[in-house]
From Swiss-Prot:
It comes from Archaeoglobus fulgidus (strain ATCC 49558 / DSM 4304 / JCM 9628 / NBRC 100126 / VC-16). It is a single-pass membrane protein. One of its GO terms (cellular component) is membrane. This is Uncharacterized protein AF_0095. Keywords: Membrane, Transmembrane, Transmembrane helix. It is found in: Membrane. The chain crosses the membrane at residues 15-37.
Amino acid sequence: MERWDPLTWHCIISSYYFYIFWNFFLPMFIVYRGFGLLDPFAVKGRYTSDCYIFLLSEEPFENVTHCSSQRQSWALWSSHQRISRLQRLTTEHHKANRGQATIRKTLA
């Protein structure tokens, strides 16, 4: 067996991946409930010591004005998208039904 065969490289690289996951990503998901620290809208401004209070509290976005406005605007935008999609579908449905009604009238 050679010293640096593919199985050895695979074991070394997978152990590095496991070490990074176990020490960095897993605690971040447990403590911060996901990528909270990497979210640019999670806290206002730069991350300081008082920002961790928001990230660890039950409702982390209550006292942060920028994030709450960002979430509200996102909710409004997504609801607008849903409403416009529904309107588009209903108008297409009515157009299709109108076309079928005219075909029925001409055939009758």
